[in-house]
Amino acid sequence: MNKKILETLEFDKVKALFEPHLLTEQGLEQLRQLAPTAKADKIKQAFAEMKEMQALFVEQPHFTILSTKEIAGVCKRLEMGADLNIEEFLLLKRVLLTSRELQSFYANLENVSLEELALWFEKLHDFPQLQGNLQAFNDAGFIENFASEELARIRRKIHDSESQVRDVLQDLLKQKAQMLTEGIVASRNGRQVLPVKNTYRNKIAGVVHDISASGNTVYIEPREVVKLSEEIASLRADERYEMLRILQEISERVRPHAAEIANDAWIIGHLDLIRAKVRFIQERQAVVPQLSENQEIQLLHVCHPLVKNAVANDVYFGQDLTAIVITGPNTGGKTIMLKTLGLTQVMAQSGLPILADKGSRVGIFEEIFADIGDEQSIEQSLSTFSSHMTNIVDILGKVNQHSLLLLDELGAGTDPQEGAALAMAILEDLRLRQIKTMATTHYPELKAYGIETAFVQNASMEFDTATLRPTYRFMQGVPGRSNAFEIAKRLGLSEVIVGDASQQIDQDNDVNRIIEQLEEQTLESRKRLDNIREVEQENLKMNRALKKLYNELNREKETELNKAREQAAEIVDMALSESDQILKNLHSKSQLKPHEIIEAKAKLKKLAPEKVDLSKNKVLQKAKKKRAPKVGDDIVVLSYGQRGTLTSQLKDGRWEAQVGLIKMTLEEKEFDLVQAQQEKPVKKKQVNVVKRTSGRGPQARLDLRGKRYEEAMNELDTFIDQALLNNMAQVDIIHGIGTGVIREGVTKYLQRNKHVKSFGYAPQNAGGSGATIVTFKG
C-alpha cells in the first residue's frame, strides 16, 4: 500500500499507541515495520492470533514475556565468523532464557485450545547445552571462575598473591608507622604503596611511584612486595588471555545455532506484539473485526483512535454501494469521519484491532487513496484548487475496483457552480468504475445527486441548533441541511429579515424541511438501535457472568470430587494396610485351615473400592426378595463364583454352606440362590481361563504374561484361592521370562503361602523357567 496514505492518516502515531504494551525490542521493531496487506490469509492469521491470545489471557491474565534486546546484528556477526564479547553473550543468554520460559509456559498451559499461537510456541528451540555454556557470564558482565579450570587456577593464584601483598604491607604499616604520613595502604598506577614521609624515603627500600603535590609524602612500593606485584601483573595478563580464549571457544559453540537463535528472537518479538495488541484491546475496549472478502464494510460505534473523547459512529458501506457523499457545513467532523474510515481499514489490514463494537466488519483493499486537507504546493505556486485537482488526477489514474478512495471537500477552491459540476462528474466516473468512495462537500447540488443516483448515498454530520454546536454524530442516509436561518435567528437577527430571506428560497426550504424530517427519523432509529445495543450488552454481560459462574461451579465440583477421591483413597490405603497385617498374622498361624484363610481374604477384599453396576445390583436385590433362602438351597458365592449348598442358619442370621470340600460362613448378601430348574452353568467372576486336563487329575493354568506387576499379583492371589476351593492338588503358573520381575514376584508369593507344599520351574518342553508348577499340601 502506498506510503502517502499512511502519512496522511498518521498511521505511525496509531502504531505508537501500542508501544507502551511491548516488552521486547524485537516486538517494537516488528510494530514499526507493520504495514497493511491485501492478502486475506495474512489478515485472518493475525485476527486468529489475537483471538487466541485473548482466550489465553482469560486463563492466564498475568501472562508476560521477559524483556529482550535486539540481537539480529549479534547473530549476523557470528555468522560472519566474528567472536562475541561478554555484553553480546548476555543478550543471547537473555533470549535463550526467554525462549525457555515461553516453552515452559506453553507446556503447562491448560484449558486453552491454541492453533495459530501453538505454531509459534512449538517453533521455539531448546538449547540446554548452550544455556549451560552461557552461564559462564553473569549479569554484571563478569566471567565466572567455573568457565574453565585454567581461569579458576589463575584467579586462585592472583587471590593468594594479593593476600600475601596485603599481609606484607600490614606488617610494614606496624613496623614503619613513625615513618608514614598515614597508617593506610594507598594505590598508585595499579600498585599497592605506602605513604612515606619525605624525610624517611631512603629508610624504606622500594620503587617510588608518586610524590604528593606538597612534596611531603612519597608513595613507595616496598621491595618486599615488588616481586609479588609483578607476579600479579603477569597473572592478570594470563587471566585476560584465558578470558579471550573462553570467548572464542563459546563463540564457536554458539556459531552453528546463530540462525536458530535469531529466529527464536523473532518469534519472541512476534508473541510480544500479539500480546501488546490484546493489552490494547483491554485498555481501549477495542475489538478484532470480522473480515469481509467482498469489500463490505460495517463499522459499529467506530472511533478515531487519535481523537480524544471521539464520538462513536456507525458506518455501513454495503457491497453494492459505491459512494457515500457527506454534505453539510464545515467544522462538523466530516474530515474526521473520512479519516476514521480510512484509518480503521488500514489498522485492520495491518492485523491490528480497531476501536469499534463487536460485529464490525472490514473489507480488503489493495490500495487506499486520499485527497484530504490543504496540500497546496508552495514550491509550484499552485492554488488550492489546482493542488487538489493535480492530486485527484493522479489518483484517478491509479484507482481500480480493489481500491478505497477518500475525497475531502471535492471541487472546493473554485466557482461553486463549476466546482459542484466537477464534483458530480468525478463521482459519476468513480461510480461507473465501481470504486468505493467516501467524499465530503459543502455543495448543496450534490444532495440531489445522492438522492437520484443508484448506488450512491447521502450522509451528513449532526448539528445541534439549540447549542449552535456540532455533535459530530454521523447520519448516514440523511443529506446535510443549511442551518443559516436558525443560527441567525438565535444570534439575534431580526425575524423580519430572516422571514424575508426564507421567502426568497421557498423551494430550498421545502428541501430543508424534508431533510429535517429525515434527521428526526434517523435520530429516532438511532435511539432504538442504541436501546437494542444496551440490551445486547446487558445480555452479553449476563452470559459472561453465567458462564463464569458455571465454570467456577464446575471447578468447585471437580475440587470437591478430587478431595473425596483422595479421602477415599486414603481410607482404602489404610484398609489395605490393615488387611496386609491381618494376612501376615493369618499366614503366621499355620494351624488355620485353608477355608478360614479364604474367608478372611474375602472379607478383606470388601475394603477395596470396586466398580459396581447399580442396575444389576437392583435386579439382584429384587431377585433376592422373591424367596427367602432355606437349608438345602443351591447357591452361588458372589466373591468367587463357586456353587455350594446351604447346610444351616446361625442365630446371628448368617448361613453355613458347603462349597466343594470347604465349609464357609456367609451373610445373605454374599450369595445368590440358584433356581432349581436352571440347568445352565452359573457365570463365574472371570479371573483367567482355567484349562483342565485329564493326565494327572484336576489341573489349572494361570497366564500372567503381558500383565503389570500389581495386576499380576492380584490375579495370582485370587487364582490360588480358587484352586484351594476346588481342592486342586497342582496348578501351573505361566509368567514368561522377560525382565524377571513377575517371575520373582510369583516366587516370593509362593514362598510366603503356608498351603504350598512345593513349587519349581516346569520341564524344558513345558515352558522351562517361563512357567512354575505349584503343588499344594494334602
Curated annotation (Swiss-Prot):
<dbReference type="InterPro" id="IPR046893">
    <property type="entry name" value="MSSS"/>
</dbReference>
<dbReference type="GO" id="GO:0140664">
    <property type="term" value="F:ATP-dependent DNA damage sensor activity"/>
</dbReference>
<keyword id="KW-0694">RNA-binding</keyword>
<comment type="similarity">
    <text>Belongs to the DNA mismatch repair MutS family. MutS2 subfamily.</text>
</comment>
<dbReference type="InterPro" id="IPR027417">
    <property type="entry name" value="P-loop_NTPase"/>
</dbReference>
<dbReference type="Pfam" id="PF20297">
    <property type="entry name" value="MSSS"/>
</dbReference>
<protein>
    <recommendedName>
        <fullName>Endonuclease MutS2</fullName>
        <ecNumber>3.1.-.-</ecNumber>
        <ecNumber>3.6.4.-</ecNumber>
    </recommendedName>
</protein>
<dbReference type="InterPro" id="IPR036063">
    <property type="entry name" value="Smr_dom_sf"/>
</dbReference>
<dbReference type="InterPro" id="IPR036187">
    <property type="entry name" value="DNA_mismatch_repair_MutS_sf"/>
</dbReference>
<dbReference type="GO" id="GO:0030983">
    <property type="term" value="F:mismatched DNA binding"/>
</dbReference>
<dbReference type="InterPro" id="IPR045076">
    <property type="entry name" value="MutS"/>
</dbReference>
<comment type="subunit">
    <text>Homodimer. Binds to stalled ribosomes, contacting rRNA.</text>
</comment>
<dbReference type="InterPro" id="IPR007696">
    <property type="entry name" value="DNA_mismatch_repair_MutS_core"/>
</dbReference>
<dbReference type="InterPro" id="IPR005747">
    <property type="entry name" value="MutS2"/>
</dbReference>
<dbReference type="GO" id="GO:0006298">
    <property type="term" value="P:mismatch repair"/>
</dbReference>
<feature type="binding site">
    <location>
        <begin position="328"/>
        <end position="335"/>
    </location>
    <ligand>
        <name>ATP</name>
    </ligand>
</feature>
<dbReference type="GO" id="GO:0045910">
    <property type="term" value="P:negative regulation of DNA recombination"/>
</dbReference>
<keyword id="KW-0067">ATP-binding</keyword>
<keyword id="KW-0378">Hydrolase</keyword>
<comment type="function">
    <text>Endonuclease that is involved in the suppression of homologous recombination and thus may have a key role in the control of bacterial genetic diversity.</text>
</comment>
<keyword id="KW-0238">DNA-binding</keyword>
<feature type="domain" description="Smr">
    <location>
        <begin position="702"/>
        <end position="777"/>
    </location>
</feature>
<dbReference type="GO" id="GO:0016887">
    <property type="term" value="F:ATP hydrolysis activity"/>
</dbReference>
<dbReference type="GO" id="GO:0072344">
    <property type="term" value="P:rescue of stalled ribosome"/>
</dbReference>
<keyword id="KW-0255">Endonuclease</keyword>
<dbReference type="GO" id="GO:0004519">
    <property type="term" value="F:endonuclease activity"/>
</dbReference>
<keyword id="KW-0540">Nuclease</keyword>
<dbReference type="InterPro" id="IPR002625">
    <property type="entry name" value="Smr_dom"/>
</dbReference>
<dbReference type="GO" id="GO:0043023">
    <property type="term" value="F:ribosomal large subunit binding"/>
</dbReference>
<dbReference type="Pfam" id="PF01713">
    <property type="entry name" value="Smr"/>
</dbReference>
<dbReference type="GO" id="GO:0005524">
    <property type="term" value="F:ATP binding"/>
</dbReference>
<dbReference type="GO" id="GO:0019843">
    <property type="term" value="F:rRNA binding"/>
</dbReference>
<keyword id="KW-0699">rRNA-binding</keyword>
<dbReference type="Pfam" id="PF00488">
    <property type="entry name" value="MutS_V"/>
</dbReference>
<comment type="function">
    <text>Acts as a ribosome collision sensor, splitting the ribosome into its 2 subunits. Detects stalled/collided 70S ribosomes which it binds and splits by an ATP-hydrolysis driven conformational change. Acts upstream of the ribosome quality control system (RQC), a ribosome-associated complex that mediates the extraction of incompletely synthesized nascent chains from stalled ribosomes and their subsequent degradation. Probably generates substrates for RQC.</text>
</comment>
<dbReference type="InterPro" id="IPR000432">
    <property type="entry name" value="DNA_mismatch_repair_MutS_C"/>
</dbReference>
<keyword id="KW-0547">Nucleotide-binding</keyword>
